[in-house]
């Protein structure tokens, strides 16, 4: 026998033996214990309502749970889609239910609807992430944890009677791997029965052709297999919601009053509201919770753990222990860290070299600029010296001309000052001669 066969034989688990009991033991009360524990703990159920503003989401929720939830009026002028969760504590008989209704406010109201699904996907992933973080805690308390994971998405389809909008197809395609989708035709009393039947066939055909996976009521449980198989053929449900009571015959029923007649909400000949309530709440609520945990959440959890480096086995199907996974991830991280450090060091060295080259280039440019300025300075200095010498020569020449002019002026002044003296002397001589002549002549 080969070594691999021996290992396979040694690792194989032995078949359990069936034994008969000699008397009553008591573990047949386990189902009762489980029921008692579940009733004590209570249940949580989270519904996501996706549909255009004013399509009747709040009214249908009030009708489904036969109460009035306090909700705010939604506007048609929302800039983007936002998720508005509201939690309520309900009790029926001795069963407590923590119900969370999440409304996609503003869905389909924007001009650009390309990313309308994004806030919805992000919200669903955020609830998965919160649950995963709670699971990964060393001291976790899932018993007291309020599970906010979306268990079902009621997708409200506008009753156009023609086909699905591209927004509906894109959104459901993005959501089908993350949540259980139950498509419903809202305000089904606005189209005729024949149009409604054709519309249902058209919707299911488009969902199948576009690969959209909606929630199928399970048929593996014999207790509900028959009714679920029948209800699967009625999808999508055409519903009418109303909290008003109208008197029909001798009793009051929830209905919508029109001039042409009355549409009874709980009359299966008028709409599929009763079918939706039975499938969603009475028959398949626990399966929706289970599908959310075992299918959608497990897919999210697996992808997240694989991103973190965890895996069940290697290529040879050998299981990894947590310690082995941790050590492998640690080595991978250290090698990546070392590689990053080497890259950063090399980048630093290259940056230093580039900086040195830039500094040398700047130094060379500055030196050339300095030499250029130095030459300009010397040239300017030479020109200034030449100008100074020319100025000195002109000054000396001016001084010489000035001295010559001053000499001429002094000579002229001296000459002009001598002429009056001569005139005085001549006058005196003339007067002397005249007096002499006057004396001698009687």
From Swiss-Prot:
**Which annotated residues bind GTP?**
51-58, 106, 187-195, 241, 256
Which residues lie within the region annotated Disordered? Answer: 1-22, 379-442
Q: Which UniProt keywords apply?
A: Acetylation, Cell projection, Coiled coil, Cytoplasm, Cytoplasmic vesicle, Cytoskeleton, GTP-binding, Membrane, Nucleotide-binding, Phosphoprotein, Synapse
Annotated coiled-coil segments of the chain:
320-413
Q: What is this protein's name?
A: Septin-8
Q: Which GO terms describe its molecular function?
A: GTP binding; GTPase activity; molecular adaptor activity
What is the scientific name of the source organism?
A: Bos taurus
Residue ranges annotated for the Septin-type G domain, each copy included: 41-307
Q: Which gene encodes it?
A: SEPTIN8
């Amino acid at each position: 026998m080969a070594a691999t066969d021996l290992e396979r034989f040694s690792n194989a688990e032995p078949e359990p033996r069936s034994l008969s009991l000699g008397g009553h033991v008591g573990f047949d009360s386990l189902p009762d214990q489980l029921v008692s524990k579940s009733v004590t703990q209570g249940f949580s159920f989270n519904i996501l309502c996706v549909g255009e503003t004013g399509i009747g989401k709040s009214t249908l929720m009030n009708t489904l749970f036969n109460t009035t939830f306090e909700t705010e009026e939604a506007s048609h002028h929302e800039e983007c889609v936002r998720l508005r969760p509201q939690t309520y504590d309900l009790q029926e008989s001795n069963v407590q239910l923590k119900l969370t209704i999440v409304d996609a406010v503003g869905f389909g109201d924007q001009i650009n609807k390309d990313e309308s699904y994004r806030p919805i996907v992000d919200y669903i992933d955020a609830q998965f992430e919160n649950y995963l973080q709670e699971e990964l805690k060393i001291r976790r308390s899932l018993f007291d944890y309020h599970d906010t994971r979306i268990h079902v998405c009621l997708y409200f389809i506008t009753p156009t009677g023609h086909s699905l909008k591209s927004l509906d197809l894109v959104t459901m395609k993005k959501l089908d791997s993350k949540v259980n989708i139950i498509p419903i035709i809202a305000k089904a009393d606005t189209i005729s029965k024949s149009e409604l039947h054709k519309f249902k066939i058209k919707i299911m055909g488009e969902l199948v052709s576009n690969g959209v996976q909606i929630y199928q009521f399970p048929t593996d449980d014999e207790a509900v297999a028959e009714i679920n198989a029948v209800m699967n053929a009625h999808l999508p449900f055409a519903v009418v919601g109303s909290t008003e009571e109208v008197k029909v015959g001798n009793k009051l029923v929830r209905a919508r009053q029109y001039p042409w007649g009355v549409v009874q909400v709980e009359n299966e000949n008028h709409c599929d509201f009763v079918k939706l309530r039975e499938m969603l709440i009475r028959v398949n609520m626990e399966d929706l919770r289970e599908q959310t945990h075992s299918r959608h959440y497990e897919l999210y959890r697996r992808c997240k753990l694989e991103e973190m480096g965890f895996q069940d086995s290697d290529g040879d199907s050998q299981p990894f222990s947590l310690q082995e996974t941790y050590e492998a991830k640690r080595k991978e991280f250290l090698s990546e860290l070392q590689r990053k450090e080497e890259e950063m060091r090399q980048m630093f060295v290259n940056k230093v070299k580039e900086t040195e080259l830039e500094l040398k280039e700047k130094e060379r440019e500055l030196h050339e600029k300095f030499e250029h300025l130095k030459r300009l300075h010397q040239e300017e200095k030479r020109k200034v010296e030449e100008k100074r010498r020319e100025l000195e020569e002109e000054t000396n020449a001016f001084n010489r001309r000035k001295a010559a002019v001053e000499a001429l002026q002094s000579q002229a002044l001296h000459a002009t000052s001598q002429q009056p003296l001569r005139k005085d002397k001549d006058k005196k001589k003339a007067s002397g001669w005249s007096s002499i002549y006057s004396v001698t002549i009687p």
